[in-house]
């Protein structure tokens, strides 16, 4: 893991990745592609340490409310999220400023933030997507070795 100060956190389409890289080890992962020009090993997670400040600034300056998307390139609930809480802080900001959320994950750690997800959904809209690759627990551990099994999801 290494930290990096970034210049922006939201894409033009309101996508947000708080982390860059992944430790899930999914054999089918597209985010490993060299077309994304990562300058470090994919498993060496880049933590966007100034993400919360940038997100708050971006949300304050938006003229229209919209859905903020996260989880497309890096799971927002990687194992280190338990300690860093960048996703939780971002959800607090999204909730506070009244934006919607679309979040993708393979982790049951999302349950930690159920209070915020419910609050966002009451005010606007919150869509949670979870990958369910296979219900075969043994196969799941082979194709997604470092994440909770489909049964836990």
For each feature predicted by the language model, list its residue ranges.
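Conserved Radical SAM active-site core
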Residues: 1-129, 135-138
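Glycine-rich S-adenosyl-L-methionine
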Residues: 146-153
